[in-house]
Amino acid sequence: MRAWIFFLLCLAGKALAAPQQEALPDETEVVEETVAEVPVGANPVQVEVGEFDDGAEEAEEEVVAENPCQNHHCKHGKVCELDENNSPMCVCQDPTSCPAPIGEFEKVCSNDNKTFDSSCHFFATKCTLEGTKKGHKLHLDYIGPCKYIPPCLDSELTEFPLRMRDWLKNVLVTLYERDENNNLLTEKQKLRVKKIHENEKRLEAGDHPVELLARDFEKNYNMYIFPVHWQFGQLDQHPIDGYLSHTELAPLRAPLIPMEHCTTRFFQTCDLDNDKYIALDEWAGCFGIKEQDIDKDLVI
């Protein structure tokens, strides 16, 4: 369970970068986008340059003018280059130009069961296959080297949301405890989580049996309503439209699969109308939230 919390803390940034909106995959298709890019804040080290301020600004302007690619965004697998008119354009990255992996944790597994040294190597390779049938079918399945993922049994599927709900609640509480000046949560979110944090009946984080998790959900149902809505809002970013595509699910799904083999099947069953998107009511219903308690105003 602690490992679960670690992963979502790494993914809790609001900017879950995904360059395009894609529907949920069919049962044989998996996530294309993965790990989100957390927005970089201001440099905490502020250097006073005094009379050199103007010169520094001029130098910065010159650098920007000489490098049109500096603020030109390219999606995963592509890099910026200048054309004959000195205009920025995105081209496929050479996989051999990707940084050498530091360790096993950087490796990723594709849906054709091939391990890539890093997500950079995967997306660069996929880009070179753009326009081909193979490239269209190639997707990133999960984070980590390829391994055997056992099928998800019906009995196991019913247990998945029990752990997931408890995890979401614990992640929010952890973010609240660590927030202070880190801006991990908005003020509105803090007010909601504060009530959960101060509730004496709250089940502390731990590796609890599913029977205990089920009883706690029944007894302390109200504690779980906001965490489920909060996670939906964290994922619904590209665009913010009240629906989750498989691209938007990727930052949550990809790290979970090696630990929770029912992840893919769970998200597939959430799509009740099979339109390849998960709406808020479908998402909340998957976690046992009652229809009368589903409120888009809680997605804050």
Curated annotation (Swiss-Prot):
Domain of life: Eukaryota
Protein name: SPARC
Annotated S-S bridges: 69-80, 74-90, 92-127, 98-120, 109-146, 152-262, 270-286
UniProt GO molecular function: calcium ion binding; collagen binding; extracellular matrix binding
Glycan-bearing residues: 113
Keywords: Basement membrane, Calcium, Copper, Disulfide bond, Extracellular matrix, Glycoprotein, Metal-binding, Secreted, Signal
Gene Ontology annotations for the cellular component aspect, listed alphabetically: basement membrane; extracellular space
Keyword 4Fe-4S: no
Subcellular location: Secreted, Extracellular space, Extracellular matrix, Basement membrane
Coiled-coil regions listed in the entry: none
Annotated ranges, domain Kazal-like: 86-148
Similarity comment: family membership: Belongs to the SPARC family.
Matching InterPro entries: EF-hand-dom_pair (IPR011992), EF_Hand_1_Ca_BS (IPR018247), Fol_N (IPR003645), Follistatin/Osteonectin_EGF (IPR015369), Kazal_dom (IPR002350), Kazal_dom_sf (IPR036058), Osteonectin_CS (IPR001999), SPARC/Testican_Ca-bd-dom (IPR019577)
Protein purpose: Appears to regulate cell growth through interactions with the extracellular matrix and cytokines. Binds calcium and copper, several types of collagen, albumin, thrombospondin, PDGF and cell membranes. There are two calcium binding sites; an acidic domain that binds 5 to 8 Ca(2+) with a low affinity and an EF-hand loop that binds a Ca(2+) ion with a high affinity.
Gene Ontology biological process: regulation of synapse organization; semicircular canal morphogenesis
Amino-acid positions noted as binding Ca(2+) in the UniProt annotation, renumbered to this chain: 271, 273, 275, 277, 282
Signal peptide residues on this chain, from the entry's feature table: 1-17
Pfam families: FOLN, Kazal_1, SPARC_Ca_bdg
Sequence ranges assigned to domain Follistatin-like in this UniProt record: 68-90
Domain EF-hand: 258-293
CDD domains the UniProt entry points to: EFh_SPARC_like, FSL_SPARC
Main location: secreted
